[in-house]
Structures are given as C-alpha cells and as structure tokens.
Amino acid sequence: MRTYVEDESDPGLISKKFWKYLKSTSGGTRVPETVNYGSRFRNNPLGQSELFNEFFCDQFSAASTYDIDIDFSNDTDFDIDFNFRKIRKLLKLVNPNKAAGPDEIHGRILKNCAVSLAYPLSVIFRTSYNSGMIPKDWKIANVVPVHKKGSKMSVENYRPISLTSLIMKIFEKIIRDELMWRCENQLFNNQHGFLPNKSCTTQLLSFTDSIATALNASTRTDIVYFDFAKAFDSVNHDIILRKLKERFKIDGTLLKFMVNYLQHREQCVVVAGQKSSSASVRSGVPQGSILGPLLFVLFIDDMSEVVSEGTKIALYADDTKIWRKINVWEDHEILQQDINALHKWSIDNKMKFHPKKCKVVPVSPPDKALQDLFNKIFPLRNIYFYNLGGVQLEFVKEEKDLGVIVTSKLSWEEQVEALLSKASSRLGLLKRTMHFLKCQKQRRAFYLAIVRSQFEHCVQVWRPSSDSVNQKIERIQRRAVKWILSEQDHSYNDLEYLMRLRDLDLLPLKERFITSDLLLFYDIYHNCSCVKLPPYIKPLTADERRRLRPKINRNKNIPDNECLSFHKLRESRNDPMSLKCEIEPKSKAFKSNFFFRTVQEWNCLPSEIKEAATKSNFREKLLEHVKLKVFKTVAMESNDS
C-alpha cells in the first residue's frame, strides 16, 4: 500500500494513481453487482450496460426534424479563426491522464505531439466548420453511468456522462468561445452555471442576501425549489436551434455547424469495460462535452422572462428556484401564477418537472406569541398551499441548495453540523487507513484534500459568526494537526497549537474563512464579479469619516470586529475605501450575512492592502497581514526564548 501511495518522483508527494484509486472507490462511478430497471435485474457488466443504455434512451424527448432556415447572406459575421498557434496551445493544455474517447486517441499523444498535430488539425477543423460536416467518429460517445442519490441498484438514480473524442473537445472549445462571445451579453444575470466568473457561491450570495434583508425587515419569504426530470437529456434539438437563430441571432455557417453537431449522434454505455450496443441520441446535449453545458444554458435562459416583477429567480444550470416576499395574501397568489408560468414554459419547451421533488421553504422571522396562538386556533387559515400542474407542493423546513442547507430560519447550524460530521468521519478514515504514513508532507496533503476541503464549498455563504461554532470547527483541525505530526497523545495549549500551525503553513480555519470572504469582496468592490454591492452598502463620506468615534464592545453578543477600536478608527478616518451599512442589523440572519460581516473586516484592513492593483497582489498582501496578526504571539514568544 505504501508504494501505491508514494510518488516515485518524490516520496513526499502522493501518486496520481492513488488519487485515481481513491476516486474510483468513493462510489461515484462504481456500479453494484446487480442493478434493476423496473422489474428487470441484471448482474453482469454487459447486461447492465444494455439496461443503462435503455433507460438513458427512454429519457429522450421526441425526435427533431432539424428543419430550420439558414441565412448565409451575412456569413462573414460568423467566420472563426482556426489558427494553428491557438490549436497548438490547446493541445499543450490537454491533461495527459484524461480518459480517451471512442477513437482511443489518448491525451498524452496529443500533448506530446502538439507541435506536429497543430497545423493538420487546424486544416481539418476549418474544413469541417466551413462544410458543416463533423466526422462521424467525433459524434460517438462512450457513456459512463454516474450515481446521483438514492439506491445504487436502480439505474434511474444515475446520470449519463459522455466520454467523447479529445480532438473533438479541442474543436468544441474554439466553437464554444465564439458562441460565448456572441451570446454572453444577451444572457440573464441570474444564470450562474457553466459561465465564466460565476459559481455556486455567486448565486447563493445574492440569494441569501435577499432573504436575510427581508428577515431583517420582519418579512416572510417563500422559496420554491424546482426539480427537472433528466433536464440535459430532454433538450429538444429543434427548439434549441430555433432559439439560437431567433433569440441569439446565430445564423449562417455557425448555425449549420450546430445543426450537424446535434444530428446523428450515437452513444453506447460502458460498465466494467463492457460496451452496450450503439443507440441514436434523439435529444439532449451531451454531459461531459464542452459545448453541451453552454447549449443548455442558452436553451433555458428565457425561463427567466416568465416570472412576475417582484418574484426573483436564480439558476445554476438546471437547478432552479424562485422566491418572493410575502407581505399580503395576494403575494401568495402571484407566486402561484409564477409557478404556473414555469409549468407552461416546461410544457412548451418539452421539458418535465418532478412535482413530487419540488419543495417550498417558507423563511419567516421568529414567531410572535399572538401569531402562535392564532395558528393553534386556526391551523390552516393562514397557510397557502402551492401546486405544480395540479400536484400540491410539499412544505419543508430545509432544502439542500447547491450543496448548502437552507433552512426556514436562514440559520447555518444544520449546514455546520453536517460538515462537522462529514469532516470528522473522513479524518477518522484517514487515521485508520493511512496509519503507516510517516511523512508529514503526505499527511498534510491528505488532510487538505480530504478533510479541510469539506469546509471550502460556499464558505462565504454559511461562515459562522459564533465563536463557539468556530471552535467546534477548529477542533477538527486540531485533531488533524496531531495526526500529521504523530502527536496524538499530546495536549496543546493555544500557543503550542499556533506554533504547530505556523510550522505546517496552516491558518486557523476562522482566519482562513475570513480571508476567503475578503478575497471575494475585493472582486465585488472592484466590479470584477457578477455579484454587486447591495444598495445598502455605501462609501463613508469625508464628513462621516471625520465624525467616527470609537465603540467599546460591552455587548458579548456582538463580535469584536463589529466595534471600531481606536487603532482601526484612525485607519477608517483616512481611508476613502471605507464602507458603511445603512441597514441596522436586527436579525441574527442579517448579522451573519456576507455583506454585513465582511464590510467590518474590509474596514479593518490597512489601506495599502485594499489599494492593491491586482487580485494576486491583494491576496499576497492579505495573507502576509493575516499571518502576521495570527502568529504575532508566537513570534513574541520565540524572541523571548
């Protein structure tokens, strides 16, 4: 096992072979010995691959005609440069360990032969694009079933991931960049999936800020989560081609190419090396391709047009939610009208929702005694039941939203507890299975990749402000440090712990989270992010900065960073980049909101850090500042000794 883990080139590193093994044993791509589709069961790889292929084909929508008028009169507008230098650069970026597609041309060959292959490929790409004819082998996919959730025995709980030709992926990257350049400015801002500078974090930040602001004003918000049935596989080719032409003004050679890209595709499913028979792909965009995700985003974009003013919508690929402030009873009815409009959109676009999987989360301020009494006397009087296509939607207290648990109180206790449980479990697994490792560098790498990474996803959204919760999270890292240093029997005081963190080049997790907040806030402040500063965050005027007075924290419920101390006061008075929040925080949800808490941290930064010209320069200065602040006590102790 030791030789399997260690990298031959550097024993301090962990071999790629081991990471691949770890991924394969995590269950994402493993198929159990027996799978079923309805009442049919298969227990051999070939039979399983056929069963998976049948299920995936059953999800296709009606076949398309591909009958669309193409206008070549302005075709020079759609000319694409297939420069061999650009292709050579893309070839050199190919991951040599990437799985080969059906053509069995491996990434290592493309990377190592980039100089020789660049020019002939540029000729092939240009000829293929101009003629609107893609080689047949480039439109064949080996499909790998990847488990989503639910029983692993049921093929219905898997999604198809397509392994296509690596050469075709390079071709697609060039086309995708052109398509993105033409369409990006026409997309609604509320789509955050598969787009540059957008992510789960950017989507959830704007969403949670809207909910927290409403809670702070004692206003209820109803959130409706939608679940598409096999969204990527259901995209009708005629509809997406029509939208490309009419909505995004794609025409001529580029549209002709897209028609051929979607036409006559074939797939076979691979399970344990056994291939199913080939099947025609009647609809959908291939998951695992380069163009597929962008085509889906373009297909679903006009969904945003159907909701009412005052109702907000957010998308991450097919993950869709709408929400609305509920001030009066009519707001329920308007939200129901929006649900109806989205249902009609799905029918018109030949997509399907899973009504049983669509949920409603009502986010309300703390109940008042009088309201509680009223609910006991008239339990159904003030409840509006939403429905989707005649099916009543279920009300739930929490819903996992892009990997983050959103609750009816907009509190993050459930999210933190889930992460603590998972991180603790993974750390325990490391201790049991990697006990033979003696190298600190390897142990540290395992901790970062398998344990600490659990706290990285969307941390700017859910970061706890409570010291007690931060201490719970830090205990995980304390245990990890003992394991990394083989000091399980030791008990550290705070100073000893900080000394070990410094030696391992680690930060306390609270400071790491704050650093993540500030790095994102830098982008937002400098308009380098799709997220914008909310209207209640304003610059401090010169007069306001002069009138600043230090605050002494007499309230233990208010974190220290919300109180402006004397040394921070001097910085803020002279700093034109200081900001203020014009909303008085009344709710716990708003106090822990990203924008409110991060403004306090931002104002406390020295002006020379905030004025950094680039993101990399800001990161460098910020980390230096944070480390100096965190390890100041350690440095003083070392000097004394």
What are these regions (language model features)?
Residues 390-460:
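Basic, alpha-helical interaction scaffolds
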Residues 337, 352-397:
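Short, conserved micro-motifs composed of acidic
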Residues 1-84, 374-387, 525-583:
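Basic/polar low-complexity segments
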Residues 111, 230-248, 321-344, 464:
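Catalytic palm subdomain of template-directed nucleic-acid polymerases
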Residues 101, 140-143, 159, 191-193, ...:
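Catalytic palm active-site di-aspartate
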Residues 175-191, 216, 293-323:
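Active-site palm subdomain of RNA-directed nucleic acid polymerases
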Residues 38-39, 469-641:
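Short linear motifs embedded in intrinsically disordered, charge-biased segments
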Residues 56, 77-286:
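Conserved pre-catalytic core of RNA-dependent polymerases
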